Amino acid sequence: MKLPKEGDFITIQSYKHDGEIHRTWRDTMVLKTTENAIIGVNNHTLVTENDGRRWVTREPAIVYFHKKYWFNIIAMIRENGVSYYCNLASPYVLDNEALKYIDYDLDVKVFADGEKRLLDVDEYERHRKAMKYSDDIDFILKENVKILVDWINNQRGPFSPAYVNIWYKRYLELRSR
């Protein structure tokens, strides 16, 4: 598939390990595409849950997906600062339909004040048994939690204040065209 260009809109689909669709985001605007990463923005984006429920994102969020790391990052721009929601997930694949990845339940939330929390550990353990995650996947995910925490602690990539400012500014420029 041809890579999306700056200003294009794509669909994002999250799946579970068993192949069931988990969640879909419609019309994520692409801000940058490289060989290994896609940066986009969601702002009042329609989200559809696997049970059919729908909702719209409340605030602008810069999204970061990578082909080598087992996580994706959502930087939510709020009045009280930027907070992050990080999904432990497979590297993304892109086809003619959507950007797709497998959500592996574990999440890291970073609050605007810098507090970090590992979320959904019980759900991860339950799904790991029920969906038979391999020992290799379990190891990879736990190693990627360490990488993610290192990025957070060192303000690397999406966790750099300059990163969010640059990409949000670019979004505003593209939106006003």
Swiss-Prot record:
The active site is at 23 (proton donor). It is an enzyme of class 3 (hydrolase). It catalyses: a ribonucleoside 5'-triphosphate + H2O = a ribonucleoside 5'-diphosphate + phosphate + H(+); a ribonucleoside 5'-diphosphate + H2O = a ribonucleoside 5'-phosphate + phosphate + H(+). Keywords: Hydrolase, Magnesium, Metal-binding. Mg(2+) 1 binds at residues 87, 103, 107. Its cofactor is Mg(2+). Signal peptide: none annotated. GO terms for molecular function: magnesium ion binding; nucleoside diphosphate phosphatase activity; ribonucleoside triphosphate phosphatase activity. The keyword Magnesium applies. Has nucleoside phosphatase activity towards nucleoside triphosphates and nucleoside diphosphates. Belongs to the Ntdp family. This is Nucleoside triphosphate/diphosphate phosphatase. It comes from Streptococcus suis (strain 05ZYH33). The lineage of its organism: Bacteria, Bacillati, Bacillota, Bacilli, Lactobacillales.
